[in-house]
């Protein structure tokens, strides 16, 4: 990782632009909103996304990512959200919950991305 004293990330990031679908979940697990976003970077434990929606810290999202012919669904918690322009915000999301099959699929694609970027 970085020697930067202000860097708080625990996992190394890989830069990959993918589109994703998200649902905003209430504290009761009910869907209160939905939209599309794109990933700015991904790691084993989270991702940074860009969208027109500003999220509050600790907001729970259900994210669906598409990898080739695979769909992966992840529940995550917004760690931070900041405006990037008048129309766009970026948000850091920490993964909370994976189905085991989705975890394996995500890990397979993340490992392939990591290998491709290291070459």
Each language-model region and where it sits:
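N-terminal helix initiation/capping motif
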Residues: 1-42, 107-119
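Short, surface-exposed secondary-structure edge patches
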Residues: 11, 50-54
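Short solvent-exposed strand/turn elements
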Residues: 15, 21, 55-57, 89-108
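Hydrophobic core residues within well-ordered beta-strands of beta-rich domains
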Residues: 16, 35, 61, 72-74, ...
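Short conserved beta-strand and strand-loop elements enriched in small hydrophobics
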Residues: 19-26, 59-71
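Short, solvent-exposed secondary-structure boundary/capping segments
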Residues: 47-51, 84-95
């Amino acid at each position: 990782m970085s020697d930067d004293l202000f860097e708080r990330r625990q996992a190394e990031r890989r830069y990959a632009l993918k589109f994703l679908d998200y649902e905003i979940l209430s504290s009761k697990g009910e869907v209160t909103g939905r939209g599309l976003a794109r990933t700015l970077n991904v790691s084993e434990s989270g991702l940074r996304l860009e969208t027109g929606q500003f999220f509050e810290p600790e907001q729970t999202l259900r994210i669906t990512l598409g990898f080739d012919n695979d769909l992966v669904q992840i529940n995550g918690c917004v760690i931070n959200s900041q405006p990037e322009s008048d129309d766009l915000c970026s948000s850091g999301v920490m993964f909370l919950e994976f189905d085991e099959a989705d975890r394996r699929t995500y890990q397979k694609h993340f490992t392939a991305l990591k290998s491709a970027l290291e070459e």
